[in-house]
């Protein structure tokens, strides 16, 4: 890891295979906490590259505990967090609204790392018992139209860095990775991101997948659709800027 850190400190970039190997080594406990914290810090100082993000994502997907809920054709609604706005858990609340409307939702989340409360904190406080048991997840989907996947149960690398992320208290590239590695690989996904470069990075990454996606970012900094500023939406076919007034009016056929 020392040689890799020196390279990164000199503003060099990792290849996709190198990035994948690093995440695998983190999951296997080959690096100490200080080394992992240093790696996280690198990506606070510069943007992550497409190849680095792809390599990190591939490693997490390869190591995940797979969950097959494809028969439900579910949607995941998720935000990166890290926008510094201290809002309540909007994407988590949205999942229940969508499930209440009869659509199947598979929510993948974790404890808060850069905020007081992450999706798992909310679920836990409401009495949800985290599980990786596929039968229980299916029953939850059948009875409530929603299943919750607590990320550390399905990915060893995310579990390995949880305490480090919490102690640092700053957003990291793991914020970027969480929404990209739902072990169900949902049919549909709505993702909120904290800046425009990440919106385009996500959009580029998802072009390689079969997921029907929409990535949103509000120009006032929220990783959500905002009521106080224009927001950008990137989908497979297009990228478009919308105004909040659209939410109160009937959209045109083109929208």
Name each region found by the language model.
Residues 1-87, 101:
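Acidic, glycine/proline-rich low-complexity segments that act as flexible tails and inter-domain linkers
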Residues 39, 123, 178:
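Residue-level signal for inorganic ion chemistry
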Residues 74-116, 175-181:
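Glycine/serine-rich anion-binding loops at beta->alpha junctions
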Residues 112-128:
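Active-site-proximal loop->helix
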Residues 125-140:
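A glycine-rich helix N-cap at a beta->alpha junction
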Residues 136-192:
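Phosphate/diphosphate-binding glycine-rich loops and adjacent basic-rich segments that engage nucleotide
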Residues 187-230:
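Glycine-rich ThDP/TPP pyrophosphate-binding loop and its adjacent helix/strand module
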Residues 248-255:
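Conserved small/polar residues in nucleotide/adenosyl-binding loops
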């Amino acid at each position: 890891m020392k040689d890799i850190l020196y390279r990164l400190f000199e503003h060099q970039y990792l290849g996709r295979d190198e990035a994948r190997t690093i995440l695998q080594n983190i999951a296997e406990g080959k690096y100490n906490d200080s080394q992992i914290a240093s790696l996280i810090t690198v990506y606070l100082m510069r943007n992550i590259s497409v190849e680095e993000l792809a390599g990190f994502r591939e490693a997490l997907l390869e190591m995940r505990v797979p969950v097959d809920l494809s028969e439900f054709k579910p949607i995941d609604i998720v935000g990166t967090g890290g926008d510094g706005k201290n809002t309540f858990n909007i994407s988590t609340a949205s999942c229940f609204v969508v499930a209440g409307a009869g659509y199947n939702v598979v929510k993948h989340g974790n404890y808060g790392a850069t905020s007081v409360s992450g999706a798992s904190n909310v679920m836990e406080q409401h009495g949800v018992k985290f599980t990786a048991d596929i039968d229980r997840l299916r029953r939850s989907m059948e009875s409530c139209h929603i299943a919750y996947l607590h990320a550390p149960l399905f990915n060893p690398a995310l579990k390995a860095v949880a305490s480090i992320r919490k102690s640092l208290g700053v957003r990291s590239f793991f914020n970027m990775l969480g929404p990209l590695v739902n072990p169900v690989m949902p049919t549909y996904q709505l993702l909120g991101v904290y800046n425009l470069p990440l919106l385009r990075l996500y959009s580029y990454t998802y072009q390689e997948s079969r997921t029907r996606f929409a990535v949103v970012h509000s120009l006032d900094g929220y990783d959500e659709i905002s009521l106080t500023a224009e927001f950008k939406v990137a989908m497979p076919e297009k990228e478009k800027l919308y105004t909040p007034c659209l939410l109160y009016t009937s959209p045109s056929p083109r929208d």
